[in-house]
């Protein structure tokens, strides 16, 4: 193990003692926000300290087994122990490196997924619907809840734009992340190549959608919106909606005047419900704009493999005639497209997580 990594790990046992003391203090227990924050850190530090203790134990086992080699009667057993200890030490070092990687505090949050039809007209809208279905089905496989926040449906099916809210427990995504941590690398341009249902000559068409994944702000993160900065319009809902459709001005559009960012919702039955949902999405979009601007500045200094998540970055191609999905950022190609479109997205998300971890390890000089 590199000395730098070992020196980092040595600090965790001491930090664990400090956190144990803090969690026993009455003033900390009385402040629920601070108590939750310290408890979260305590869980992370406990995990690292525990794995490092195991690493040190296996180092001691290895040293003992090497001494046993000098005894002819014990040599065979010692050789087996040496092999087992060396194998586990390699695995533990890799695990510890990943546990020390900088964490994005937003990874544990719920997320909004915004899917917009792009080039390709009706076919693009149909593909936007396919993507929404793919994410919804994946969410179901890992026990997440999906709520449609707003939807602008196309006349022939699919969506011109749809916003989903996905809620789930932390630790259920790849590498133990939450919803946002699992899905954040889905942001960007998604291209589809297939024969549209309306194509009579059997020609393959190319169309595209853009996806933006935004963390849902919690009550402590949420920005305060000045009512003077908002323009709120009501209008009659359109599209699927049952008997109430077009009878009341229940749909709501909110414009944030300083930024020009817009959010609307017409899925709920009441104006109050639609306004609340629109404001939720608006807050997430404003924060995502600030986040994207920061990411763009960082990307100008260092162009990462995964990219900045900008909508203009073409990240993936879905080729239906070949049954192929290609993620261009990490040169991943899978020939199981139909299964992926049915929600079998885990392998793709895991590969992106591992690529990002490898990037971070390289930056820290650990690989």
Swiss-Prot record:
Q: Which family does it belong to?
A: Belongs to the prokaryotic/mitochondrial release factor family.
InterPro entries in the cross-refs: PCRF, Pep_chain_release_fac_I, Pep_chain_release_fac_I_sf, Prokaryotic/Mito_RF, RF-1
Q: How is it modified after translation?
A: Methylated by PrmC. Methylation increases the termination efficiency of RF1.
Q: Per UniProt, which keywords does this protein have?
A: Cytoplasm, Methylation, Protein biosynthesis
- Entry protein name: Peptide chain release factor 1
Per the record, residues carrying N5-methylglutamine are 243
The family database entries (NCBIfam families) matched by this protein are listed as:
prfA, PRK00591.1
Cellular location of this protein?
Cytoplasm
Its job:
Peptide chain release factor 1 directs the termination of translation in response to the peptide chain termination codons UAG and UAA.
| Gene name as annotated | prfA
Please report the organism this UniProt entry assigns to the protein. Answer: Acidovorax sp. (strain JS42)
Presence of the UniProt keyword Protein biosynthesis in the record: yes
Q: PANTHER family of this UniProt entry?
A: LD18447P
Name any GO cellular component annotation: cytoplasm
Q: Which GO terms describe its molecular function?
A: translation release factor activity, codon specific
């Amino acid at each position: 193990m590199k000395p730098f990594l070992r020196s980092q790990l040595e600090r965790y046992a001491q930090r664990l003692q400090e956190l144990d003391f803090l969690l026993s203090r009455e003033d900390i227990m009385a402040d629920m926000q601070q108590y939750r924050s310290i408890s979260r850190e305590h869980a992370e530090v406990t995990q690292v300290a525990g794995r490092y203790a195991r690493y040190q134990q296996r180092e001691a086992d290895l040293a003992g087994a090497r001494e046993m080699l000098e005894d002819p009667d014990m040599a065979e057993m010692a050789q087996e122990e040496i092999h087992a200890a060396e194998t586990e030490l390699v695995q533990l070092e890799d695990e510890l490196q990943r546990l020390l990687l900088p964490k994005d505090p937003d990874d544990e949050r719920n997320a909004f997924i915004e899917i917009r039809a792009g080039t390709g007209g009706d076919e693009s809208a149909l593909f936007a619907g396919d993507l929404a279905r793919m994410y919804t089905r994946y969410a179901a496989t890992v026990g997440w809840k999906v709520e449609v926040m707003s939807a602008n449906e196309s006349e022939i099916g699919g969506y011109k734009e749809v916003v989903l809210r996905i809620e789930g427990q932390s630790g259920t995504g790849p590498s133990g992340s939450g919803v946002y941590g699992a899905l954040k690398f889905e942001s960007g341009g998604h291209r589809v190549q297939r024969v549209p249902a309306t194509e009579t000559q059997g020609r393959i068409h190319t169309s595209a959608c853009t996806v933006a994944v935004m963390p849902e702000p919690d009550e402590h993160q949420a920005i305060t919106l000045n009512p003077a900065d908002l323009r709120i319009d009501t209008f009659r809902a359109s599209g699927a909606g049952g008997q109430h459709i077009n009878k009341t001005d229940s749909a709501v559009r909110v414009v944030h005047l300083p930024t020009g960012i817009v959010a609307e919702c017409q899925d709920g039955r009441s104006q109050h419900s639609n306004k609340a949902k629109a404001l939720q999405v608006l807050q997430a979009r404003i924060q995502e704009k600030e986040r994207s601007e920061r990411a763009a500045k960082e990307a100008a200094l260092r162009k990462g493999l995964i990219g900045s998540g900008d909508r203009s970055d073409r990240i993936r191609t879905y080729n239906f005639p070949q049954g192929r999905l290609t993620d261009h950022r990490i040169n991943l190609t899978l020939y199981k497209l139909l299964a992926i479109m049915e929600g079998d997205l885990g392998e793709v998300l895991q590969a992106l997580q591992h690529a990002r971890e490898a990037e971070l390890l390289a930056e820290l000089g650990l690989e």
